[in-house]
Design a protein with these regions (language model features):
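A short beta-strand micro-motif common to beta-rich folds, especially ectodomain repeats
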Residues: 72, 179-189, 715-721
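Short, hydrophobic beta-strand segments
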Residues: 73-74, 166-174, 697-709, 898-902
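Catalytic-core region of carbohydrate-active enzymes that cleave or remodel glycosidic bonds
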Residues: 415, 420-502
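Beta-sheet-dominated interaction scaffolds and their linkers
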Residues: 21-77, 609-655, 686
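Surface-exposed binding patches on compact interaction domains or structured appendages
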Residues: 21-54, 78-168, 663-687
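Structural preference for beta-rich elements and adjacent junctions enriched in aromatics
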Residues: 706-955
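Aromatic-lined carbohydrate-binding surfaces of glycoside hydrolases
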Residues: 75, 90-92, 137-156, 162, ...
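Catalytic domains of carbohydrate-active enzymes that cleave complex glycans
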Residues: 313-399, 405-406, 492-659
Length: 955
């Protein structure tokens, strides 16, 4: 990768021009907020949240003692820009001056990602190589800020038609006076007129104090640091940390993390452990104290701030249970308690006791069995019985998961014995957290993944890193815990992140040696995490000065649900639209937050605050974050059961969700109905609906015949929620309808569709991606799938044509095992078939589930065997269906024949079955379906409609 991008890093051209005549630098300079990810092919925008081309000025808002960042973008419009450097003026204000040395700049280095988790595929885009500008390499401003002779110190190059975004940071010192400061940053080059961009910084009368900050406890992994900066074996840490060059690299790593507001720690170094002849524990602390002591006491950062928390050097590695007959043995208990007592005594002697926590990485899974949970309880009791009186930390789930659909979860109540709960964000429940905090327990936020928490993954939207501290504020956490902050892959700067099991959220810094730096360099995510920490300080200031409601309104508008609050039907189903990712909205929120903080804490604002502008900003913010929505959950048909009636009843189940601050009332009704159709259960009253609440209603209309569908089996019916002054919202309900055609001669089950009769109303096509967008607005799958159905009176025949785009393929292992993640399959090219012959099923247990892979190897089951389970699973009843699969150049086809006797007694079968087809195409990660399921395919309410001949099923 480095070879590919070096030409735009090095100064290989002659500069702005030859000769002595001054030239104009052929570039446009503009700016965006720090959370905006600039595409290299993106040309200059006329306006952003901090920049307007009209006067060409960058306008920023800051507090005192804050670091503010933005993207300075250089767009080479007509010709290449080369040989330019940055110059900056002092920041001059009416109340004083801030030196130009407060302005720093970084050149992003791209990190390539080729594999993506399901949350990304659902919400951000499909699988393809993407380069993310994440490693930030310091570059000179006014000739200082990078090592001379390094790649980073070379002049900048921007190719014609491209843009280069530099990350620029302005450090507002603690002694700065509030007020408006002006400066400029210029592009300069040989024989060129400097290209000057004015900057205005409004420093508000708000002081950011670390005393109201949120501690971010960050684990430092030594191996990657040692391997990147020295030739020492990273496995031999004892030798490595004794070497000056290694120590220097580690110190710089600690210092960089501390500089960005984190509290780093290391749990990989232990005292030397032995036993005397009587079996007593002997600990040699000399090496441990020499290495860890300065970091615990604050020697690893410029402010001399000691570590917020430091794990007592005890755990599953030392003393190792296997050396003392295992975790359940009395011998291990005695050694462990003796070890703990001596470790505590040493920490007390050194003055480190108030920072110490006890943590065992056991069990290592989030779903432990009963014996593992009892072992944890016993372990905690041993710790407490040792009399060390130190907080015990656990990552376990502190509440039963049965209410959330995880009926198989083994829960043991450890509330009374665990002191610090650091449960992964996905399982943090608001009511449980509140109760733990009421009991005096400490809770830490352990980020994992969206939508339950912002993600620190390289590929995550940039706002996610910033949102983590906001979530900690909302949930009342004492700290944020990042167990891995430096665990970068060995060739992270050279090779793509491509393996499915390869993390991309385990490091916040990068090895800087490649760029000529003698220590690590920050990531863009670290900068945004720091921005969120500074936001947290403003939120705390608002709360402590009687404006908690204002702080809460801002935070709850950006993060509307987190933890279990983001669950849908169960713990594996998620509401993906409960977070705001728009970077401009986050920039607006940050500006409002600092203005509100100044109004709350200052008697002398930096300059008069316009209440009219403040109100306009609030209205703009709330309009961007709060909405009134209508979601369609089900669109089903059934034969009209009323005496003397024929035709079909069409029922739409819909949810109205109000995020508006004012109470909402209105009526939900059908839009225009097709000719001949009539509403029979319509015009439903909803409300008063309070802020962030949901109301569910059903609308029913009668159709004399089944609705006339398009060629792919879809009929669109609009519904409308009229809330008067609050607005009118329209939604599209998609009735997915296919008729089972009758055939006298059934098709051969040979994997070929050649002998199928021409498709008419028995076609199922136009598969759409299962994402969080509304039904008809969902994107068409590039790899389309078409289904056909027919019957000969004894069997249901299904034909499937699964198309694949030209390009790379994945290796499909011939196996009838399917892996699921977030209620969708992963890894294989396959089609799922979901059937509800009763038409009234309510849960996954009730459905018939078939999985056909492109390799064959089908699965036939009753229920869906996802893990962890969301319901019961049973073998397929009755005869095993016949099947055949054929692969070709443009995809694959499959045929399946299922005996109707498998689907229960004839009298229990409905004339309209619930039915859906779903397709996973693994090359791009497309997961699509026919029936337009809202979030996942295993809820029978989301199925489409399979209509049998009027004579009945199996006639």
């Amino acid at each position: 990768m480095l070879v590919a991008i070096l030409p735009v890093w090095g100064c290989t051209w002659a500069g702005c021009g030859r000769g002595t005549e001054e030239r104009i630098i052929p570039a446009r300079v503009w700016a965006t907020g720090p959370s905006y990810r600039v595409n290299s092919l993106e040309l200059a925008r006329a306006e952003t949240s901090i920049f307007a081309r009209g006067d060409g000025t960058i306008r920023l808002t800051s507090a005192v003692n804050e670091k503010i960042g933005f993207n300075l973008v250089i767009s080479a419009v007509d010709s290449a820009v080369s040989g330019v450097e940055l110059r900056a003026d002092d920041l001059a204000g009416t109340e004083g001056k801030i030196s130009a040395s407060a302005i720093r700049a970084y050149r992003p280095y791209p990190i390539t990602v080729e594999r993506y988790p399901n949350w990304f595929l659902r919400t951000q885009g499909l699988r393809e190589p993407r380069a993310y500008p994440d490693a930030l390499v310091p570059i000179p401003v006014n000739g200082v800020g990078a090592s001379p002779g390094s790649i980073a110190a070379q002049p900048l190059v921007v190719l014609a038609g491209q843009s280069l975004a530099l990350y620029v940071e302005i450090v507002i010192p603690p002694e700065a006076r509030p007020g408006r400061y002006k400066t400029a940053i210029s592009l300069v080059g040989p024989n060129c007129t400097p290209l000057r961009t004015p900057i205005e910084v409004l420093v508000r009368d708000v002081y950011l104090d670390s005393k109201v900050s949120i501690p971010v406890v960050a684990g430092v992994q030594l191996g990657p640091v040692i391997a990147s900066f020295t030739d020492i074996d990273p496995q031999n840490k004892s030798v490595a940390i004794s070497k000056p060059e290694c120590r220097k690299a580690i110190e710089k790593t600690f210092a960089l993390l501390s500089e960005h507001g984190l509290s780093p720690y290391c749990d990989e170094i232990y005292p030397r452990f032995s036993q005397d002849v009587d079996g007593n524990t002997v600990l040699d602390w000399s090496e441990y104290d020499a290495f860890c002591g300065p970091f615990i006491e604050g020697g690893g950062n410029a402010e001399g701030r000691g570590a917020f928390a430091w794990p007592l050097p005890v755990g599953m590695s030392q003393p190792h249970p296997s050396q003392f007959d295992g975790m359940d043995s009395a011998a291990y208990m005695l050694v462990l308690q003796d070890y703990l007592s001596k470790a505590r005594a040493h920490f007390e002697e050194k003055g480190w006791l108030e920072r110490a926590v006890v943590y065992f990485d056991y069990p290592s899974v989030i779903d432990p069995n009963e014996s593992e949970l009892q072992r944890v309880r016993r372990l905690i009791e041993w710790v407490h019985d040792a009399g060390i009186e130190l907080p015990y930390m656990s990552k376990l789930i502190p509440q039963p998961m049965t209410p959330f659909g995880w009926t198989a979860y083994h829960y043991v109540d450890l509330t009374r014995v665990v002191d610090i709960w650091a449960t992964p964000a996905r399982y943090q429940d608001a009511a449980t957290l509140a109760e733990l905090q009421r009991l005096g327990k400490r809770t830490w936020l352990l980020p994992d993944r969206p939508p339950y928490c912002g993600s620190l993954a390289v590929e995550a939207p940039p706002t996610h890193a910033r949102s983590i501290a906001w979530q900690a504020y909302l949930q009342g956490h004492e700290a944020i815990w990042l167990p891995r902050a430096t665990d970068w892959p060995g060739k992270v700067l050279d090779e793509a992140i491509s393996q499915d099991d390869q993390a991309s959220d385990a490091w916040l810094v990068y090895p800087g040696k490649l760029f000529g730096c003698d220590g690590p360099v920050p990531s863009a995510r670290l900068k945004l995490l720091q921005a969120g920490i500074q936001d947290y300080q403003c939120l705390r200031l608002l709360s402590e000065h009687g404006h908690a409601a204002t702080a809460g309104l801002l935070a709850r508008s950006l993060i509307k649900a987190c933890g279990t609050g983001a669950y849908g039907d169960n713990f594996q189903d998620a509401h993906w639209d409960r977070r705001i990712d728009d970077p401009d909205v986050w920039d607006l929120a940050a500006a409002i937050l600092r203005e509100e903080a100044e109004l709350a804490v200052s008697e002398h604002p930096a300059e008069p605050i316009s209440l009219e502008k403040n109100r306009a900003d609030w209205l703009r913010f709330l309009a961007a974050t709060r909405s009134l929505e209508v979601w369609v959950g089900s669109a089903r048909l059934r034969k009209d059961p009323r005496p003397g009636q024929t035709g079909y009843l069409a029922t739409i189940d819909a949810e109205v969700r109000s995020e508006l601050r004012t109470s909402v009332e209105g009526r939900l009704k059908f839009g225009p109905l097709a000719e001949g159709a009539s509403a029979i259960d319509d015009d439903k009253q909803i409300g008063p609906l309070e802020e962030m609440s949901v109301a569910s209603r059903s609308l029913t209309a009668r159709f004399p015949e089944a609705p006339l569908c398009d060629l792919d089996g879809h009929y669109i019916q609009s519904i409308v929620f009229d809330a008067g002054r609050s607005g009118l919202v329209e939604a599209q309900a998609t009735f997915s309808i296919s008729r089972v055609s009758e055939v006298s001669k059934p098709p051969r089950i040979d994997g070929s569709l050649d002998d199928w009769p021409p498709g008419t109303q028995n076609v199922m096509g136009d598969f759409r991606l299962i994402a969080f967008t509304h039904g008809s607005a969902r994107r068409r799958a590039e790899s389309q799938t078409i289904g056909y159905c027919c019957t000969d009176g004894s069997k249901l025949y299904l034909g499937i044509q699964a198309l694949s785009p030209a390009g790379p393929t994945v290796s499909n292992v011939e196996s009838n095992i399917v892996t699921y993640e977030d209620l969708r399959p992963v890894g294989s090219d396959l089609v799922e078939i979901m059937i509800d012959p009763t038409g009234v099923a309510t849960q996954s247990d009730d459905i018939y589930h078939v999985v056909v892979k492109s390799t064959g190897n089908p699965i036939f089951e009753r229920g869906v065997s996802v893990s962890p389970p969301i319901g019961s699973v049973a073998p397929w009843p009755g005869p095993r269906p016949e099947y055949s699969v054929t692969r070709g150049a443009d995809g694959w086809t499959a045929e399946i024949a299922m005996s109707l006797e498998c689907f229960g007694p004839r009298e229990s079968r409905n004339l309209v079955w619930g039915f859906n087809l779903a397709r996973l195409e693994p090359v791009r990660g497309e997961y699509s379906d026919w029936a337009r399921a809202q979030r996942y395919c295993y809820d029978p309410a989301s199925f489409g409609n399979l209509i049998w001949p009027d004579g009945g099923v199996g006639e």
